[in-house]
From Swiss-Prot:
Annotated keywords: Cytoplasm, DNA damage, DNA repair, DNA replication, DNA-directed DNA polymerase, Nucleotidyltransferase, Transferase
Gene name for this UniProt entry: dnaE2
Enzyme class: transferase
SMART domains: POLIIIAc
Keyword ATP-binding part of the UniProt annotation: no
GO MF assignments: 3'-5' exonuclease activity; DNA-directed DNA polymerase activity; nucleic acid binding
EC annotation from Swiss-Prot or TrEMBL: 2.7.7.7
Catalytic activity entry: DNA(n) + a 2'-deoxyribonucleoside 5'-triphosphate = DNA(n+1) + diphosphate
Protein name per the record: Error-prone DNA polymerase
Function: DNA polymerase involved in damage-induced mutagenesis and translesion synthesis (TLS). It is not the major replicative DNA polymerase.
Length: 1153
């Protein structure tokens, strides 16, 4: 092809959020297709998108690889015109990062406040000291190196570096309307700053005055003795994106297309143009085109030059990091295996230490060990998971909890001699105390060497529809109707049926336009947020590697690159993750120690100790149990019937897209239950290799269930090379690469079939791999989670009182709301007592035994809107010097420790709580110990003076006035009490809303949930109604929706097939009280579903709960006295049904997708 003749230096990608109209990858692809010499990505005060452009150069489908220029568009807060800044080498790149970091760290999240003085401070020609900095390479494996200026002689770059040139190349970008003197002044300041290395951009705007305008700019440039340089100031890779870019402008400026006016581009010309078009536009000034080539040729920097160095860790005098790691390993062996280890485990540990030494990863392991050590010193539960669970060294260091004697380890999946990839250790900490660990990391390494990885928040269907609707000027009702038809977070847009269900015309041109633009917008980056816990640490300044900015959360900073970006540039991260179940387990252990005198740690709970725990799980009794409480897992438990720890490993992994999409679940269950023989696939005609898969698939009965098995089949049976297997692993491991995994299909299935394997087996194996590309568990990860499955199941079985209390104190977390957690505990014999000012604390607590278990007293934290403090965060308050947050509960406890409460007036005076707090307590029925039910308490509270503690003489006066004026109050109906309970504490101990509607539904032939769940006749028609607890639409279910209904008798599980879902989308997605008719589907193991055929939203029936004629059905099972919160107050009369009360909507369901 002919030599390139143009380089576009002014590209704004969609990482200039709500401005650029194309992805960085699209610009690279288009530049390649156009044959451009180079392309410069310069986003607004950010480098967030450059790694994606850099990675795209590895795309084998590019027929030509343009040179990539890494830069940023500096936008100033002091009126300085925009400036494109491109570093010539690694040192200049470091200064650009620090410049951007300075602007970001003085501003709020997502903002960058720069002044010209900042540019002066960081634009120095002297190269800063950079320990370990290698000389920039003159070539890049990421780009075809073509001399972009024929006049530049070979060795020019070397001469520049020898002369000490290291600078930011600065291009002043004048706005469309400009004052000549302002541009002249800006150029004067820039040339005074660094002499050469300054340009003036010449940009055509196609508004009829380009010739005159560009001539003015050329005269200014000549007078300032700086070259003019051509650019199209690009906003999108193709002109078809103009409409979408207009929408982004409207979203950014909070306006509509009709009102935006001159905020919008006047034409569609701001796209990436071919050389010929740019040459035509600048035919009167061809040197402006040639200058783009000279500009690009002066830049040698590429991201290949980023040489990441992990921080050194402190070690004892005279020891290396590797020696110290070995010492800690030996100490761990002595602690975990006091009787010594066998030869096999010794060989495993020695092998791991050898690989760690060769890869020089010892400091990384020491870092994670230190973080875990700190957490445990603060009594914070933690455990490692993921591929790190393949490491015996991690186990004896106390990082992971998977005993290497219980499971076969595959260390090569974690760290390999062949793979040039850093290890990645994920450690889960209690979600309520993880912030303490994160602040410890900041203190230890400093904010210039430690920061959190970012997460790119992308447009998803709902947000895209909402923003496009607003930009196009659609009414809020129309936009909401369209958005409400979308289920979940991901998707490709709306179909015609969904539009019709929203009550809209799918042929309406405005609706069509909105849907088309929203579909195009899906997947666009919206803004950056912080990763859930991935830290990057560096030996030198992190802010010379990548810009750092402030997070929205106080005391948090994060870098501009996400986990895939740092992987591309080979940075190592430490994942400090939050897990609610660890909080629950620790709080459960604390309650057991406090009330039962026994202290437990995670390691004390052995997974083979209690056969009754497995029996409980076999029955599917897993509400609240980690990882196995979803409907799919509850249905799998009776079918798989786990009997040992490894069965739990399989249970965790089997209900995942990988095994499901690969059609591996049913064959495994049939073999496990003896319904089909265990056979191992083997290649026909290869007698010597007949059992080559037995060692891989032996533990899973010849059926591949885990990611590691799929990889090993690819290597050993499909004969993938290690490099190909690594590419396959990477494609499986990241969500972003879903779709690219398909390129391995022909090779893997073809190789398996060619070697004599059954084509069906070959295809199923690959379908499983594609499932892992969406979401799948490796064996090591499943083993880590299986440990917590057992511990939480043990807590539930052995200490249901402590488990319930701890779950409530750890909310929000898990699959079920407090009402279901409490209901499950009551079914297991635990008494639950209501919130009461005489007995409750801020947290839920255990009280004296009532039968086999302690009673659970609900705490003030259960009252919505009531202020309470979580003392798990006390260390953070102290470290920051902050005052603890207001805790109304603590005031109550402090007051009653001084003197018992005798009346509402005395309570108000003693606690000095604001009126708002008193109303919340009354509405939560928390004054029963003062012989006041909800209505009487609300009436009495409202008669008190507002927010003024009552003096003693005023108390007597107020009481006399109340006695004189008060009329007898009718008792609140029980139905209204139940609804009020749900509104205030999100559960009721007095009854269930459905029991008051039972007569209504019974008249319609509606069965109770228990009756449906106990039916064993397949195909029998049934009707059911209940409150929607959970909606779930897992990706592996191919559009099937699972719904859990609850009534006063229990729960029923619904299956909604895609066709029914589309027909009744509104009811499925929005109903709080759902009526359903369908057919029973019962499995031999006793798992029952109602397959829905018709659904009706009956939420309006909730209004009947305020009807004075509604009473509980006589057939309803009476509430057991054990769980009646009137037990504390026997002198209160039973509730009678007298008077209506406004009924509010019940709390929403928990929806998962």
């Amino acid at each position: 092809m002919t030599a390139p003749r143009y380089a576009e230096i002014g590209v704004t990608s969609n990482f200039s959020f709500l401005e650029g109209g194309s992805h960085p990858q699209e610009f690279v692809q288009q530049a390649s297709a156009l044959g451009l010499a180079a392309i410069g990505i310069a986003d607004r005060n950010t480098l967030a998108g450059v790694v994606r452009a850099y990675s795209e150069l590895d795309n084998e489908e590019l027929f030509y690889k343009p040179k990539l220029l890494i830069g940023a568009r500096l936008c100033f807060a002091d009126g300085t015109p925009d400036i494109l800044a491109y570093p010539t080498d690694r040192a200049a790149y470091g200064r650009l990062c620090r410049l951007l970091s300075a602007g970001k760290l003085r501003a709020g999240k997502g903002e960058c406040h720069l002044s010209f003085a900042d540019l002066e401070a960081f634009t120095k020609t002297s190269t800063p000291s950079w320990p370990g900095l290698s000389r920039p390479s003159t070539s890049s494996s990421k780009a075809v190196q073509v001399s972009v200026d024929a006049r530049v002689k070979p060795g020019h770059d070397e001469a520049k570096r020898a002369a000490g040139e290291s600078r930011l190349l600065l291009v002043l970008m004048p706005p469309y309307r400009f004052q000549s003197h302002e541009i002249t002044a800006a150029l004067t300041r820039l040339t005074a700053l660094q002499g050469a290395g300054v340009w003036l951009a010449l940009v055509p705007y196609y508004r009829g005055d380009d010739k005159r305008r560009l001539a003015r700019l050329q005269r200014i440039a000549a007078a300032a003795r700086v070259p003019g340089i051509a650019s199209n100031d690009v906003l999108y890779h193709h002109e078809s994106r103009r409409a979408l870019q207009d929408v982004l402008t409207c979203v950014r400026d909070k306006t509509t297309i009709d009102k935006a006016g001159r905020l919008l581009e006047s034409n569609a010309e701001r796209y990436l143009k071919p050389t010929e078009e740019m040459a035509r536009l600048f035919r009167a000034d061809p040197d402006a085109i040639a200058e783009t080539l000279r500009f690009a040729d002066r830049i040698s920097f590429t991201l290949d030059e980023l040489k990441y160095q992990y921080p050194d860790e402190p070690v004892p005098p005279g020891k290396t990091a590797q020696q110290h790691l070995k010492d800690l390993t030996e100490q761990g062996i002595a602690e975990y295996f006091p009787n010594g280890i066998d030869a096999k485990l010794r060989a495993t540990i020695d092998k791991e230490l050898t690989i760690i030494a060769h890869r020089q990863y010892a400091p990384y392991f020491l870092t994670v060990h230190d973080i875990v050590r700190y957490a445990r010193s603060q009594n914070i539960l933690c455990q490692g998971r993921g591929s790190a669970a393949n490491s015996a060294v991690c186990y004896v260091l106390g990082i992971t909890c998977v005993d290497p004697t219980e499971i076969d380890l595959l260390f090569e999946r974690f760290v390999s001699e062949e793979r040039d990839e850093p290890p990645d250790i994920d450690v889960d900490f209690e979600h309520s105390r993880r912030e303490e660990v994160m602040q410890y990391i900041y203190r230890r390494y400093g904010r210039h060497r430690a920061a959190i990885v970012s997460t790119v928040i992308h447009y998803r269907p709902r947000s895209a529809i909402r923003d496009v609707g607003k930009a196009l000027g659609l009414s809020e009702d129309v936009t909401a109707a369209l958005a409400d038809t979308v289920w979940g977070s991901w998707g490709k847009g709306l179909n015609e049926m969904q539009v019709r269900q929203a009550g809209l015309d799918p042929t309406n041109p405005m609706i069509v336009r909105a849907i088309d633009l929203a579909t195009e917008l899906i997947g666009f980056p919206r803004h950056l947020s912080q990763h859930v816990g991935g830290y990057v640490l560096t030996q030198d300044r992190l802010d010379e590697f990548v810009p750092i900015g402030n997070a929205a959360m106080e005391e948090r900073t994060f870098i501009e690159w996400d986990k895939d970006d740092i992987d591309a540039v080979k940075m190592m991260k430490v994942d400090v993750l939050a897990l609610g179940m660890l909080t629950c387990i620790r709080k459960g252990f604390d309650l057991i120690a406090q009330h039962k005198g026994k202290r437990y740690e995670l390691a004390d709970i052995k997974s083979e100790d209690d056969n009754e725990v497995y029996k409980m799980l076999q029955r599917g009794e897993s509400v609240g149990v980690f990882q196995v409480e979803s409907r799919a897992q509850m249905n799998m438990l009776p079918r798989l019937r786990p009997r040992c720890f490894y069965d739990l490993v399989i249970e965790v992994a089997i209900v995942r897209p990988g095994p499901i999409q690969g059609d591996m679940v049913h064959p495994y269950l049939r073999r496990r239950n003896g319904q089909e023989p265990v056979v191992y696939p083997s290649p026909a005609g290869h007698a010597g290799e007949a059992n080559e898969l037995k060692t891989i698939l032996g533990k899973t009965l010849g059926v591949p269930l885990f990611q590691e098995q799929a990889m090993r089949i690819a290597i050993e049976a499909a004969h993938f090379t290690p490099d190909e297997a690594n590419q396959l692993r990477r494609a499986m491991a990241t969500f972003r690469n879903v779709g690219t995994i398909g390129k391995f299909e022909a090779k893997m299935t073809g190789n398996l079939v060619a070697r004599g394997y059954d084509p069906v087996f070959a295809q199923n194996c690959f379908e499983q791999i594609k499932g892992f590309g969406s979401y799948g568990f490796p064996e090591s990860h499943a083993a880590s989670f299986a440990k917590l499955v057992y511990v939480s199941a043990w807590l539930k079985h052995a200490h249901p009182d402590a488990f319930c209390c701890a779950l409530l104190n750890s909310q929000p977390m898990g699959f079920y709301a407090p009402a279901q957690i409490v209901g499950d505990a009551r079914q297991n014999g635990v008494e639950i007592r209501g919130v009461d000012v005489a007995y409750s604390f801020s947290q839920n607590t255990l009280e004296e035994r009532c039968g086999q278990h302690h009673a659970v007293r609900l705490g003030f934290r259960q009252i919505d809107g009531f202020r309470w403090a979580d003392f798990d965060e006390a260390n953070l308050w102290q470290a920051r010097g902050d005052a603890p947050p207001e805790d109304w509960g603590a005031r109550i406890v402090e007051a009653r420790e001084k003197s018992p409460f005798t009346s509402l007036e005395q309570f108000a005076r003693a606690t000095a709580l604001p009126k708002r707090a008193l109303i919340l307590l009354a509405d939560a029925d928390a004054f029963r110990s003062l012989k006041l039910d909800r209505r009487a308490a609300l009436w009495a509270v409202r008669r008190l003076p507002d927010d003024v503690p009552l003096p003693l003489f005023e108390v007597a006066k107020a009481r006399e006035q109340q006695d004189e004026n008060a009329a007898p109050l009718p008792l609140m109906p029980l139905a209204e009490h139940v609804v009020a309970d749900y509104q205030t504490v999100r559960l009721s101990l007095k009854g269930h809303p459905m029991q008051f509607l039972r007569a209504l539904f019974a008249a319609e032939g509606v069965n109770t949930c228990r009756a449906v769940s106990e039916t064993r006749r397949n195909g029998r028609r049934a009707r059911c109604a209940g409150v929607v607890l959970v909606r779930q639409r897992p990706g592996s279910a191919k559009g099937v929706v699972f719904i859990t209904l609850e009534d006063e008798t229990g729960i029923a599980n619904l299956v909604v097939w895609p066709a029914v879902m589309e027909k009744f989308r509104k009811e499925v997605m929005g109903a709080r009280l759902l009526w359903v008719e369908g057919k029973i589907q019962a499995s031999p193991e006793g798992v029952v579903h109602l397959v829905a055929e018709e659904l009706v939203d009956r939420s309006a029936e909730m209004a009947r709960l305020s009807d004075e004629l509604i009473a509980p059905s006589a057939s309803t099972e009476r509430e057991a006295p054990l769980n009646d919160d009137r037990r504390d107050h026997p002198d209160l009369p039973a509730q009678q049904i007298r008077h209506p009360r406004n009924v509010r909507i019940l709390p929403p369901s928990r929806d998962f997708h």
